Amino acid sequence: VGGNLCTFNLLQGTEYMPDVKNKILFLEDDGESGKVFNRNFDRDLQSLLHLCKGKNIKAIIFGRAQKNCEMTEEKWIEIIKNKKELENIPIVINADFGHTTPICTIPIGGYAKIKFDENIDIEITK
């Protein structure tokens, strides 16, 4: 399950909010907030984690932020480490999907497998 994090927040409390339990989440953002992107992304992510209590999420893959957002690897790590709900969830950052180039299309509702070792392998299985 995945998509734009701001849109997920707009769906919270509606019948259209997808069930995130036992799912791999693919999350990205459009970067319209520019230099305050990391603060807004942090807040939007926390809102989503409060909704699902961070339980039973299999993994989260974050799409790479646009350059104007000035989102560094250090900022990603800081946001992730400050979320106790994410402590035991595998996380991938800077994946090539979302509002950036190059872009990978990810089928929503499909099945995927993630392997974490020397490399991170993401395989769409169905």
What are these regions (language model features)?
Residues 1-46:
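ATP/pyrophosphate-binding catalytic subdomain of soluble kinases
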Residues 17-19, 53, 84, 105-106:
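Solvent-exposed alpha-helices and their adjacent loops that cap or buttress functional pockets
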Residues 23-25, 58-61, 89-92:
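Structural motif
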Residues 26-30, 61-66:
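Glycine-rich anion-binding loop/nest that anchors nucleotide
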Residues 37, 50, 69-73:
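Short amphipathic alpha-helix initiation/capping segments at coil-to-helix junctions
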Residues 43, 55, 75-79:
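Short amphipathic alpha-helical segments
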Residues 48-58:
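Phosphate/pyrophosphate-binding loops at sites that engage ATP/ADP/AMP, CoA/4′-phosphopantetheine
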Residues 64-126:
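ATP/nucleoside-binding phosphotransfer catalytic cores, i.e., glycine-rich phosphate-binding loops
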